[in-house]
Amino acid sequence: MTSSKPKKTSRVRKTTKNSKKNNPVTMPVLPKTPPSFKNKVVDKKALKNLVSWAYKTHGTAITSAMADNLKDLGFKYATQAAVSISVDDLKVPEAKQDLIGQAEEQISATEECYRLGEITEVERHTKVIDTWTETNERLVDAVKNNFNQNDPLNSVWMMANSGARGNMSQVRQLVGMRGLMANPQGEIIDLPIRTNFREGLTVTEYVISSYGARKGLVDTALRTADSGYLTRRLVDVAQDVIVREEDCGTELSIVVEAEDGKFGARLLGRLTAEDIFDAEENIVVSQNTAIDPSLSEEIEKASINKVKIRSPLTCEANRSVCRRCYGWALAHNHLVDLGEAVGIIAAQSIGEPGTQLTMRTFHTGGVSTAESGVVRSRISGKVEFSSKAKVRGYRTPHGVEAKQAEVDFTLKIVPQSNNSGKAQKIEVSSGSLLFVDDGEEINSDITVAQITAGAVKKSVEKATKDVICDLAGQVRYDKVIQPKEVTDRQGNITLKAQRLGRLWVLAGDVYNLPPNARPVISSGKNVDEGTVLAEASQSSEFGGQVRLRESIGDSREVQIVTTSMSLTNFKLIEESTHSGQIYNLESSDGTSYRLNISPGSKINSGEVIADLTDERFRTKTGGLIKYAPGLSVKKARSSKNGFEVSQGGTLLWIPQETHEINKDISLLMIEDMKWIEAGTEVVKDIFSQTSGIVTVTQKNDILREITVRNGNFYECDDEEVLNRFTEEGNLVNPGEKILDGVDNTEILFVQKLETSKCRGLLLRTVEEFTIPDQAELPQLSHVKQEKGPHLGLKAIQRLTYKDGELIKSVEGVELLRTHLSIESFDATPQMTIDVESIKDDKDESINRLNLVILESILVRRDTVSDASHGSTHTELQVNNNQLVKAGDVIATTQILCKEKGLVQLPNVVDDEPIRRLIVEREQDKIKVKISDKAVVKVGDRVVDGDPITKTVKSTSCGEIEEISNSSVTLRLGRPYMVSPDSVLHVKDGDLVLRGDGLALLVFERQKTGDIVQGLPRIEELLEARRPRDSATLCKKSGIVQIKKGNDEESVSLSVIEKDDLVNEYQLLIGKNIMVSDGQQVTGGESLTDGPINPHELLDCYFNDLKDQKPLIDAARESISKLQRSMVSEVQNVYKSQGVAIDDKHIEVIVRQMTSKVRIEDAGDTTLLPGELIELRQVEDTNQAMAITGGAPAEFTPVLLGITKASLNTDSFISAASFQETTRVLTEAAIEGKSDWLRGLKENVIIGRLIPAGTGFSGFVEELSSEAGPHPDILAEESGGYRRAQNLRPDYTVDMPQSPAVSSTAILDDPSDEDLETTRNRHGIDPSSSNFAAFARPNAENQFSEDQLPDPAALEGLQEEGLLSDE
């Protein structure tokens, strides 16, 4: 953070100008004399200055002693004064009631304007909020004055005023008013809290207040995290910026311009880049002098407006900043020390205020504030604009017609002759709003102007607000609105207003018509109460027999029997069981069906209604099922119902009894593979049902299953016989030979059995079941009708199990089921079938089953009228049991008129049905009596106060309907102002009810000036994000040409560049053009409004400059232009929050963001296209190419956001410890990168001493020892001479043989000491070394055989320019 300025004291300048010249970096000596005694109150600021003076003059020890003494002094007097705070100290200023009264008057006036349609809903909201904000500001002044005049020693006032604790914003809430609050979405609630905490809040206010307080807390939590992350990224990008050099010797500099002749703190601690002369050509400050406050004042006194200073942005030190470019270290106001980690200091200086700014909302408890420079007149008098004033009409956000200044000028209020006093001067900046006209006479305390602050760029956002209708009626547009249909990308058509205008709703009684109602009356008819306005009819779809039901609720049901089917050859028999009623169908031949449904239920088509109760297909036990050839089923199995039989045949059944047991083996009571009789106990309490051979399945001494298979067992050892059969079993037809001595006269199922004792075959009997092709059903019914749905019954046979399935069971199972299912044809899916039980026609004692399809029609009851519907009357047009045809009307509903009046129908579009109509009643009109001629005509729309005749004014809003000699009839209405670009939800002539949406107002609103918008903005700048809807920038300098298109909207903009090239720019709809026709523009200038895309800006600067200058200069200059704009943008955000950060910190960060260029074309260099590399490095490479005559590399400058810059640093350890660790390390490994451990982070991770502070000197020694005999290698890029090994193998540069070049390439021979240290470091014995570079050739020691030079190494050293060709 910047230190506050030392207190201005009389300075003793000891150094003379001459001595400064000789010794470039002298520090002006600070006065040792203390500031003179001042007899006035010392507040927080004065204390700050005192302590800072002591620290800068006398160092830490003395300052801390002084601070201690100050503390004792403070406590001593605080104890004696016994200051405390009680509730009585909170004094509410008397002016509060008046101020709130004034505000309420203004607001009711605003509401009235809104009611008259003079301002839009948005303007009303804005005006209300601004009125309260302004009242709040005035109340703060009242609080200050009240305390100052009436009670200057009030303890609350002393506390806030001295800076001990609290601030005016908090005191205002205690004794003024709490003010406006924001809701959780950040929108301001237009109901302010008028009370303060001293008076206490009402319940509503309390709830709203806690809303805002909650938002403050939540915001704080979120912002703290954001701010911390921002600091982390900043530290990461700048951690390796350390002051490593005394002076980089650059000749570049940046220019600082004075604002209003003042430099403020912007020159403090910087070194001048050149001598500064005053108007008489005397040197004011010589080159490389640090500027202290007194020098800064001298420069201002000499009215010098531009000063060139050295800056980290232009420092040419390699990978660091030199002392002179950085200037003072702001901790002690002396030149920065070598080894100072200025990057980290910069990162913390920018990141730390983020957290503070967060606290901003927190301390004011979420109360919203907004800054506006409203100027009020202090005297009454006449307004005079200066001669150069230029103004144009402007509608303010409050809907007030005002003037906007186009240029800066001065406005005077000259007092009237009788009132002697000084004229009031107001400096008006361009863009400010003026509420008075030139020459107008005004009173004192009138709002004259609203001056815009240039520096603060308030961010605006697009927002929308709905306009809701307050009364029912008919919509009319004013002509000025000029609605236009706009089609968006999805093809949706919306209606938009093009101009500011009113949308009227003219009163009337609007009726909603039911969906199928049609008006039976024509437009313009007079109607009485009870007249039928519209009729709706309900008709039958299919026709049939009518059944009238009892009424239910508010509607009656009419049923029409479309189809009915009675099962006349079945009796319906009801049985009662303990689980409920069961119904059976019995036919005359004795077959019986069990019904699955009960009368009174509804079923769908295809449902099974009954099952045949058939014992023929029931088995006694479980077993194995086989389909004999010829029996086929449909593939699909419905899991519940089994397989449908498509062709009858024989079903084979091999019974076997299976007991599933899961008990201990000790309970087994029989032996495996033994024959048992029916009734044998196999396991305790489990008995066999059949006789046969028993098989036991066990696992881990647990009995799993016991199977009993009937049949005869024959022992057999003949392999050939046994191999014919399997353990699963085979079917054997009658007459086939199985074993000698066994005759088979029927189908048998033969299984091979092997036990420990014997082997053999088990012959099992097979039961056969015959299945018919069709289910035997008594007469199947089918009912057919000419039109509409009909019904049929169908019998389906389904097999329960699939072929080869083993059914493990003791009880029997049903193998085949016969279902009765109902089918309906031509019915709609939502039609259900009703099941009914009816008495037989001939014999009342017999019940029959009846299936019907019903069409049900709900007929409305009569209703009494309500707000949106007229009363209705419904009549049935049919009787019970009547037969009706399809399309016959069953009932009609009439909509009746509520009150007498005039009917109007809306305009019909494309045969759309009419859904609403309106009746204009007597109470929707008023008559105004007139005596003289009317000044209005029929169809005019007037609001309160508009003249109807010269003497009579209108008392309400509405449209003139008729004018007679004695009166004017006005149809009441309500105007709504809509702004341009609003979306209209209704068309001209539409009918609306109260609460309908009329339009969506689109407007730009300022976001509350809170770091909530500050932090993201800083992040956006430092991450170099591409903003949405960015401004169109001029690519190259030239002259603007603007052409209007055919319609008013479209405009084409082109720039005529030099060589008469015309460059046309595509303009997006809704963008405002910021330049005028014929204006001269430079590359990078904004042509339209909107946020600027920094990447595009850099490209524009570079493309514009590279035609005029060499590539490297163009890159330098374009980067420097971008850097300046970035620094000022970041500063603007912080300044708007009242935070002071020294420019140099931001410069250090911006320097890191702009240090790289992207190679576009490598030329003959070893660089790769697309590689990101430092500008200085490319410059060196290209200089080498210029010497060797190769093609230089071409490049474009790039701007990297802080995250991207961190990931692109030379150190892969630092990058990997920041983000995307895996990717960074993988790439580094593949590319074979080396990390030279230059920054702080890498060294911390490796665990070495960091190369800053006290570790700096060791680092320098290590670097120089690493360079060995060639210290200039330190200036080389990170690879050093190892880069020679990375050259592409197929790559050679032919060195031109001119002697001039080779002579420049010869280096001074290293001294003997250099060679010695290098040999020692690498442990090289000169006698045994065969590497020529480490031995000095002399007369005896020519390149002898044993000292063969390594050709690759020599070539590498030559290419690096470390060895000459000779």
Curated annotation (Swiss-Prot):
Sections of the chain in a coiled coil: none
Biased composition (Low complexity): 1354-1366
Cofactor notes: Binds 1 Zn(2+) ion per subunit.
Matching CDD domains: RNAP_beta'_C (cd02655)
Positions annotated to bind Zn(2+): 248, 315, 322, 325
Gene3D superfamilies reported in the protein's UniProt record: 1.10.132.30, 1.10.150.390, 1.10.1790.20, 2.40.50.100, RNA polymerase Rpb1, domain 3
A GO CC term attached to the entry: DNA-directed RNA polymerase complex
Keyword Lyase listed: no
Cofactor(s) listed in the protein's UniProt record: Zn(2+)
Region entry Disordered, spans: 1-37, 1292-1366
Reactions the enzyme catalyzes: RNA(n) + a ribonucleoside 5'-triphosphate = RNA(n+1) + diphosphate
Family according to the record: Belongs to the RNA polymerase beta' chain family. RpoC2 subfamily.
Matches recorded under NCBIfam families: PRK02597.1, rpoC2_cyan
Role of this protein: DNA-dependent RNA polymerase catalyzes the transcription of DNA into RNA using the four ribonucleoside triphosphates as substrates.
Protein name per UniProt: DNA-directed RNA polymerase subunit beta'
Species assigned in the record: Prochlorococcus marinus (strain MIT 9215)
